[in-house]
């Protein structure tokens, strides 16, 4: 077989155009190892093959180049967009990679006649109003709780709202004004919803004026209880403003991006993103990019801006602590956002203070991450030594969860590169086995998980943990032998005689005596961490499946209740719980339910 000719960099570069575009560098296996953009393709690509001035990391990358492909674009901004689409899809070895697949959450104020306040993640619907995005779900829930306390907006689903006959607990604790049972007029509720919307838009001054006016009007009409309620609203709002608003002058939307590196460069990097919407500081989020070691912080910041805002909501202002190429990034982000986006790399005054705070948070997050990683490295090394293994990195753990054989779920969680990899977790519905047969369930999930690896797709993890004892590990071994994966490293994690944490025994195939590590052994702590996560993930899925099954089965067992009537009942009362608490008269109001059938349903459920 004739060898592939060596890559002739000089000849290749000579034929490149002096135009903007994107280049893809490939190794001898045809894998893309780096994607880059250029204002001038000829100059940029040629610079990689100069004799001096290349960083060691770049030299290593260039030594692996076996081919280069280029795409000419109409502008630098277009090249930047294409570059980052390719980086997202190809995950090249030498590109800085930011992984954050989950979309950001929003507060939603629905378009209902009595608007509902809620948590939303996913596509936006023009019928509703959305506020955010927020950096994490916790900040959304905190905002909802604050808005409930101040404006008493409902949070119940529309199906529950339309079928209530008495106010819920939230009304009793003054977190809802009770529109479901007409305890507040539509006009008054609409005013409260409008004030909540204005507040979320950052127009807190307007909201305070509105509530103050209503307080004075109530006092003049000697409605002192109502006036006191407005007074409490004003006090709560002022406290929130003191804590959350960073720019009381106007409803500012801005992101603040700060970067720090371990040991002032050369090590791990953290990018902290602080979000301000409507003048409110919504919190921050830290990112730890892959392959960023050795790059200067300006390059890291540029990669973050280009990758993070791809197909995401973009604010009017982005404050960055590094000298990034403003013109091309502003052009790209403005095009993406559909409105003008300004990148400020030299903030002054209060905005400089925001950047300093974001930088401090980035440094703190990096310090905490490195501390956790050091602990994980210690645990992983201890486990390697205890198991007499080398090169231990990727661990997968399996658990089975069911209730007396019902709603069986298997979980697989993944530990890799010193941390749990949530995006790689998987749940498996287990059917077609004898209910309660844990061994059959384990055979099923392992066969489904590893059959593609047996066919040559992908690689086995370095270690497979099975939550269970000798029977479970034997079942796992049978599957691996059947699949031809005899070199799989299997370890069973049995709870020990007293089933107490710290007394776990490690079971090995073909080894009669189990291994029991001391309670304070770092390797045991890592196994417990992974096993507990598999257990949690399995139970969560099992409970969801069980709840869904029982909602249907409780009504299905009642003679005369078919799919149509069951759906009518669940829709009217907002679920099985609502059906159970309904009176005979209330049940009778559902479509297709006669008096006799309502009495039968009531008897069966009580």
Swiss-Prot record:
Residues 205-240 form the UVR domain. One of its GO terms (biological process) is SOS response. GO terms for molecular function: DNA binding; excinuclease ABC activity. It is found in: Cytoplasm. Residues 18-96 form the GIY-YIG domain. InterPro entries: GIY-YIG_endonuc, GIY-YIG_endonuc_sf, GIY-YIG_UvrC_Cho, Hlx-hairpin-Hlx_DNA-bd_motif, RuvA_2-like, UVR_dom, UVR_dom_sf, UvrABC_protein_C. Its main location: cytoplasm. Keywords: Cytoplasm, DNA damage, DNA excision, DNA repair, Excision nuclease, SOS response. It comes from the Bacteria. Pfam families: GIY-YIG, HHH_5, UVR, UvrC_RNaseH, UvrC_RNaseH_dom. The keyword DNA repair applies. One of its GO terms (cellular component) is excinuclease repair complex. Belongs to the UvrC family. Interacts with UvrB in an incision complex. The UvrABC repair system catalyzes the recognition and processing of DNA lesions. UvrC both incises the 5' and 3' sides of the lesion. The N-terminal half is responsible for the 3' incision and the C-terminal half is responsible for the 5' incision. This is UvrABC system protein C. It comes from Nitrosospira multiformis (strain ATCC 25196 / NCIMB 11849 / C 71). The gene is uvrC.
